């Protein structure tokens, strides 16, 4: 299985998504520091929200097979600049979380923001009702080589 590194703002659902992908019960847990596991690297939202911590994201990205940009479907703006993941030199996917909270037009806008930031493939998910998680797991278990281009 490929190791994912989750990057996204606070409260976007990174930890809930990690718990769902592991088959764990959902419970709120504030991530205080970068948490490593064989399956995932879970980063605190503050690392994205505070640019002086970007170096920690870049360094941690070296240990990941895939970068996962995470943004909730009801987000009002994108914290990711265009080409955000280019310096990480890793294939990137976009995960739109909390899809049960937004209209399709809003979900499309959030997916476009993730594409502009560098996501080569987008997954629409909801940890609450487990929608979209099978597609993410299929991607992670795929034996196909990863590519850095679209």
UniProtKB/Swiss-Prot annotation:
A biological process from GO: propanediol catabolic process
Keywords: Bacterial microcompartment, GTP-binding, Nucleotide-binding
Pathway: Polyol metabolism; 1,2-propanediol degradation
Ligand binding (GTP): 8-15
Segments traversing the membrane: none
Domain of life: Bacteria
InterPro entries xref list: EutP_PduV, P-loop_NTPase
Induction statement: BMC production is induced by growth on 1,2-PD vitamin B12 medium.
Pfam families per UniProt: PduV-EutP
Compartments in which it is found: Bacterial microcompartment
GO molecular-function terms, A-Z: ATP binding; GTP binding
Keyword GTP-binding on entry: yes
Misc: Bacterial microcompartments (BMC) 100-200 nm in cross section are formed during aerobic growth on minimal 1,2-PD-B12 or anaerobic growth on 1,2-PD-tetrathionate medium, but not during aerobic growth on glucose, anerobic growth on glucose or pyruvate-tetrathionate. BMCs can constitute up to 10% of total cell protein.
Its biological purpose: May play a role in the spatial distribution of the bacterial microcompartment (BMC) dedicated to 1,2-PD degradation, perhaps being involved in cytoskeleton dynamics. This subunit is directly targeted to the BMC. Might bind GTP.
Protein name: Propanediol utilization protein PduV
Gene: pduV
